[in-house]
Structure formats: structure tokens, C-alpha cells
């Protein structure tokens, strides 16, 4: 049933391996690259091609035990096999493993070939078969699916009958209340009529026929007085003079399908010669794009101070020589809560915490090694590995590589209102300051005012804006813009796109068409640093939609290449969105938006983000 079983060190040295069938490709290398190096070791299984892989760690000796089998099979004994092999292997070669851990030069792989794996496998398989046969005893009728169904139907019938009785009782109570209300009303009417009869008998008949000067009776006068006292007033129609005075302040309605006046046309004019407005040009100059980060000496000072902040939770482990699962559980629960407070998405926080726990469990401490320092280092290493980009994107170097041959094209995508146009202008300023000739392409042909907004940036930065107006095909506009840039000698084309929700299929299909049809060099997702779960959902769905909705015959389908996080200056130390987005997709964060000026664009400093997250 198994295809292979491998025992290797965390450094990549294979100590023992056994193949039961020919393996296609390198599933273990894929596991290391896509799971272990990306801090996803908390996951229980990994599938690639036709294989399913499961693994376990021995942190005390820095070992990994990996089993590979066909994913079409459901093998119930895999977990037990991994645990048993780990215990037997460590018990059998403990001294060798200690020497290997102390010195990487001490490698005697031949010594491990004596390990008798087949005996352990046969023993585990037999125990699994016995357990399955014992579990296959006849079930009681109540435990079968049919018995459960009958039981559920009986319960539902009883609930319905109870509800019917309850409804009947309520209806009966309503009828009784209505009867009582009628009876009370009839009694009140009888009392009033008897009072009226007594009043009529006391009054003379002549008084009933008396009239006032207008011919109205006294009773009618009383009715009029009662109405006036009640506050009711008959609406009096305004006089023509009053209507004229009130209509002077009202503006005429402007109908959308009517003709525009000359004044209205002038108000809508956005051309350069409108009202002779002077354009304020930005002074382009180089600026420091790297984040400010405190000196490394501060870390040494912090070590001398008493432990505070989140790391105080680890004081409870002081004195333990080996970290076990029971020690870690309450601490990791607190750390998960700490991460969510820092705006890390809950599911991402859970996976990170599990990965940290997996890396710490069973770790043996040196004689004078503090638990706090070990745990802190493990956390820093884990989060640093998550944020470290797997693909190094150097925009300046890539632009320089194609300069003179063709323009380098960058697409800015994202949902509505995150600051795509603003950050496009910031990147344009940065590239222009580094000596490259840039052009803006207005491919947001959907939102009213988008072209005018981009034109404002183009005028201030003194760069050319390529536009074809509204209601045009964005992919065709981008294609024409890139062709125009090539003919006129531009180095970079920055393409602005329509803001769209991640579940809007027509707009996502249009974005996929733009990206894949024009074979752009870089696709950036612009997201807010303020969001947690929403940002992850937006990014993952944008990423999937670009590939799934692509209508192209190209073998290489384009997806998101990098991330720009905006409004980073508003979140203080709640930097969790950066962790969530990078962990969920593996895409690097290229820039951080830190303000409203063109120079408020920074590269992310991983050390600074880790420090904010852990304190």
C-alpha cells in the first residue's frame, strides 16, 4: 500500500529511506518547498500529483519522518505507523543521533541501514486489521442509519404535535380575550347611554332649538370647539403672493436627458485651457524608499530588561529542560489571541500557532539556555520565514533589463477605494526619480471620474496619460497603450484598472483578459492594511479568478505577482494583515503606502513587522 518511507534531518540529509514502488517526480522535495519552508508544518497532510504525504517531527533530534502513498487509498494506520517508527528509530540510534546533532560533520549513513522497517509495518497493519474487524460487529437497530431515521421522525412528529397544541391554546386565548373585550365595550356603551338619557331629561326642549347668529345650534358649537382644541387645522391654500415669495429660493431641476446649457458644459470641461487654471508640477527627486528601523543595539538592551508584553507568558516554562505539549497548549492559546488582536486572520493565526508548537514540542534546552529566548527565537524565525519572499522582485533591475527593447508594463488591481490610482502615482514618482520615462494608461473605463483623477496625477508628475475615454474595452486600451509606449520610447507603462469586488465575475473576467492578453510584466494587488479576513478573501479570489477565468491558449497563465499594502501609517502595531495575505498566497509585499504624499511609499522591513507583531 505504501510507496515510500523516508527519515531525514531538518538540514536535508536522508538517514534512511525505503521505496516500495517507483516514485514519479520528487514529492518529498515538493513537501519541503511548499509546506515545510513556508511554515505550514501544522498541516497534517499534503497532496501532489497522485500522491498523498504525511509526516511527523522529532524536534529533540531535528528529524522528519515522511510516508508517501497513493491518494486514492484511505490508510487508517498511517498516524500510528509514523509514531511507532519514530519511537523505535530514536530508541535504536539515540547515541548516533546525538553525535549527529552536535556535529554536522559526523555523518555515518550506513549505520542506519540496519533499521528493520518491514517488521514494524507488518505489526501496525495487523493491529489495524484486528481493530477494523472488532469494529465491524453487528450494530443495534437504534445505531443503524434506518434506526436513527425512524427515531428522528418520531421526535419530529412529537415536536409538531406539541407545536399544534401550543398554537391551538394561543388561538383559544385570543378568542377569550376578544370576547372579554366585546363584553367590556358593551357595558361601557350602556353606561354612557344611560348618562345621556338623564342629561336630556334635565334640559328643556326649547334650549335644543336655540340657534346662534350664524344659525348653528349650541351642540354644533361645542363640536367645533372640541375640534379646534384638538389641534386639527384645515390646510389653507397659499396665496399667490406667498407662493411667489417661497419659490424664489428653489433651483430648477436638471433632467438627465435634457440639453446642457453653455454654463453646464463649461463646468464639465476638464481640458488644459479650462479657466486658464495653472497646474502645480511636482519636483521629482530621489527619496529613501526603505522603512526606518531601530538599531539592532536596541535588541541587546531589551534582553537586559525584565520580560514584558506577550513574552511574559513563557516565564511559566522556566526550569523545564524539555518542552512538552502540555506546557505549550495554554501559552500557544494566548499567543493565538495575541495574533488576532494584531489583526491576523483567525484561521491564519491558528495555523501559525500550530506550526510554532510543532517546532517547539520535544525541544531540549541547553544547560544555561532560557526557555523565553528559545521560544521567542522560534516565533521570530517562523514569522520571518513567512514574510520572506520566495520570489525576489526587483522592479528597477527588471525595467533596466528590457529598457530600449520594449516598455515594462505594471497592472494595478484591487477592490474599490483602496487607493490604486494614488499608489500607481507614487510608483510612477519613484520610477521617474530613478531616471525612467513613465506613461500612465487609463484602463478604468467604468468608474465616472477615474480618467480625470488619473489626469490630475499625470499633470502634477509631468508624465503622459494614454486614454480612450469611458465604456471601452480595458484590454484593448492597455494593448494600444503598450504599443504607443513602444513606438514613442517609454520605459514603463503603469496601467490603472477598475476597482471591482472579488465575486463580480464579469469584471474579474475582464481583468483576467487584460492581464493575459497583453502578457504584462507585473500584476500587483493593492489592498488595505486595515482589513483582516476581508483582505485574505479578496487576494485569494483575485488570484484564483485571474487563472480560472482566463480565456487564452497560453501555457503560462498570469496571476498576482506582488502586493501593495496601503494606509499602513494608520494601523500602529496592528500589522496582522501583512501576515495573513502573505501566508495565504505566498505573494510578497513589495510596497507599503504610508501617507498622502508621492514620497510616502516604503519597502517593507521584515524585522520591524516581526517586532510589532510580537510586542
Swiss-Prot record:
Subcellular locations according to the entry: Endoplasmic reticulum membrane
UniProt feature, compositional bias: Acidic residues: 193-202
Molecular function, one GO term: ATP hydrolysis activity
Classification via InterPro entries: AAA+_ATPase (IPR003593), Longin-like_dom_sf (IPR011012), P-loop_NTPase (IPR027417), Sig_recog_particle_rcpt_asu_N (IPR007222), Signal_recog_particl_SRP54_hlx (IPR013822), SRP/SRP_N (IPR036225), SRP54_GTPase_dom (IPR000897), SRP54_N_sf (IPR042101)
Keyword field contains Plastid: no
Cellular component GO terms held in the UniProt record: endoplasmic reticulum membrane; signal recognition particle receptor complex
Biased composition (Basic and acidic residues): 139-181
Residues where GTP binds: 414-421, 496-500, 566-569
Pfam families with a match to the protein in the record: SRP-alpha_N, SRP54, SRP54_N
SMART domains (alphabetical): AAA (SM00382), SRP54 (SM00962)
Assembly mode: Heterodimer of an alpha and a beta chain.
Job description of the protein: Component of the SRP (signal recognition particle) receptor (SR). Ensures, in conjunction with the signal recognition particle, the correct targeting of the nascent secretory proteins to the endoplasmic reticulum membrane system. Forms a guanosine 5'-triphosphate (GTP)-dependent complex with the SRP subunit srp54. SRP receptor compaction and GTPase rearrangement drive SRP-mediated cotranslational protein translocation into the ER.
Comment, domains: The NG domain, also named G domain, is a special guanosine triphosphatase (GTPase) domain, which forms a guanosine 5'-triphosphate (GTP)-dependent complex with a homologous NG domain in the signal recognition particle (SRP) complex subunit SRP54. The two NG domains undergo cooperative rearrangements upon their assembly, which culminate in the reciprocal activation of the GTPase activity of one another. GTPase induced rearrangement of SR drives SRP-mediated cotranslational protein translocation into the ER.
The family this protein is said to belong to: Belongs to the GTP-binding SRP family.
Protein's name in the database: Signal recognition particle receptor subunit alpha
Organism, scientific name: Dictyostelium discoideum
Gene: srpra
Amino acid at each position: 500500500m505504501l510507496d515510500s518511507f523516508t527519515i531525514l534531518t531538518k538540514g536535508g540529509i536522508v538517514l534512511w529511506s525505503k521505496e516500495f514502488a517507483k516514485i514519479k517526480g520528487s514529492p518529498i522535495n515538493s513537501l519541503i518547498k511548499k509546506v515545510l519552508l513556508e511554515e505550514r508544518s501544522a498541516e497534517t497532510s499534503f497532496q501532489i500529483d497522485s500522491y498523498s504525504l504525511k509526516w511527523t517531527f522529532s524536534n529533540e533530534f531535528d528529524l522528519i519522518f515522511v510516508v508517501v502513498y497513493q491518494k486514492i487509498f484511505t490508510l487508517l494506520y498511517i498516524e500510528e505507523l509514523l509514531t511507532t517508527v519514530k519511537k523505535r528509530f530514536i530508541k535504536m540510534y539515540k547515541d548516533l543521533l546525538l553525535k549527529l546533532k552536535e556535529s554536522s560533520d559526523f555523518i555515518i549513513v550506513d549505520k542506519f541501514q540496519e533499521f528493520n522497517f518491514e517488521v514494524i509495518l507488518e505489526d501496525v497493519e495487523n493491529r489495524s486489521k484486528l481493530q477494523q474487524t472488532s469494529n465491524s460487529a453487528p450494530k443495534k437497530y437504534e445505531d443503524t442509519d434506518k434506526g436513527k431515521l425512524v427515531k428522528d421522525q418520531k421526535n419530529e412528529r412529537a415536536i409538531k404535535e406539541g407545536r399544534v397544541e401550543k398554537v391551538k391554546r394561543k388561538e383559544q386565548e385570543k378568542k377569550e380575550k376578544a370576547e372579554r373585550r366585546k363584553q367590556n365595550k358593551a357595558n361601557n356603551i350602556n353606561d354612557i347611554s344611560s348618562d345621556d338619557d338623564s342629561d336630556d331629561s334635565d334640559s328643556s326642549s326649547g334650549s335644543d332649538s336655540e340657534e346662534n347668529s350664524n344659525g348653528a345650534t349650541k351642540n354644533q358649537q361645542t363640536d367645533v370647539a372640541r375640534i379646534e382644541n384638538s389641534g386639527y387645522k384645515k390646510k389653507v391654500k397659499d396665496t399667490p403672493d406667498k407662493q411667489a415669495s417661497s419659490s424664489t429660493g428653489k433651483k430648477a431641476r436638471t433632467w438627465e436627458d435634457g440639453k446642457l446649457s453653455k454654463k453646464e458644459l463649461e463646468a464639465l470641461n476638464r481640458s488644459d485651457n479650462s479657466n486658464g487654471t495653472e497646474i502645480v508640477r511636482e519636483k521629482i527627486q530621489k527619496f529613501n524608499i526603505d522603512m526606518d528601523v531601530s538599531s539592532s543595539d536596541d535588541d541587546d538592551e531589551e534582553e537586559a530588561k525584565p520580560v514584558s508584553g506577550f513574552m511574559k507568558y513563557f516565564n511559566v516554562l522556566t526550569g523545564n529542560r524539555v518542552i512538552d505539549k502540555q506546557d505549550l497548549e495554554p501559552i500557544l492559546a494566548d499567543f493565538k489571541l495575541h495574533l488576532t488582536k494584531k489583526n491576523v486572520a483567525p484561521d491564519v493565526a491558528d495555523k501559525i500557532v500550530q506550526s510554532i508548537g510543532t517546532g517547539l514540542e520535544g525541544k531540549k534546552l541547553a544547560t544555561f539556555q532560557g526557555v523565553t529566548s528559545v521560544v521567542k527565537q522560534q516565533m521570530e524565525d517562523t514569522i520571518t520565514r513567512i514574510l520572506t519572499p520566495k520570489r525576489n522582485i526587483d522592479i528597477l533591475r527588471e525595467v533596466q533589463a528590457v529598457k530600449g527593447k520594449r516598455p515594462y508594463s505594471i497592472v494595478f488591481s484591487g477592490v474599490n477605494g483602496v487607493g490604486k490610482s494614488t499608489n500607481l502615482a507614487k510608483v510612477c514618482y519613484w520610477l521617474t526619480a530613478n531616471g525612467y520615462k513613465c506613461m500612465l494608461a487609463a484602463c478604468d473605463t467604468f468608474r465616472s471620474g477615474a480618467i480625470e483623477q488619473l489626469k490630475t496625477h499625470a499633470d502634477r508628475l509631468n508624465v503622459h496619460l494614454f486614454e480612450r475615454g469611458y465604456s471601452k474595452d480595458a484590454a484593448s486600451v492597455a494593448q494600444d497603450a503598450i504599443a504607443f509606449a513602444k513606438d514613442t520610447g517609454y520605459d514603463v507603462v503603469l496601467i490603472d484598472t477598475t476597482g471591482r469586488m472579488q465575486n463580480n465575475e464579469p469584471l474579474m473576467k475582464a481583468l483576467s483578459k487584460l492581464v493575459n492578453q497583453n502578457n504584462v510584466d507585473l500584476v500587483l494587488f493593492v489592498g488595505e492594511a486595515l482589513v483582516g479576513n476581508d483582505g485574505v478573501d479578496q487576494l485569494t479570489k483575485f488570484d484564483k479568478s485571474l487563472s480560472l477565468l482566463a480565456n487564452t491558449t497560453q501555457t503560462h497563465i498570469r496571476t498576482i505577482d506582488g502586493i501593495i499594502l496601503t494606509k499602513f501609517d494608520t494601523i500602529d502595531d496592528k500589522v496582522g494583515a501583512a501576515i495573513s495575505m502573505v501566508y495565504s498566497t505566498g505573494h510578497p509585499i513589495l510596497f507599503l503606502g504610508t501617507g498622502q504624499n508621492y514620497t510616502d511609499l516604503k519597502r517593507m522591513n521584515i524585522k520591524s513587522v516581526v517586532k510589532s507583531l510580537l510586542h
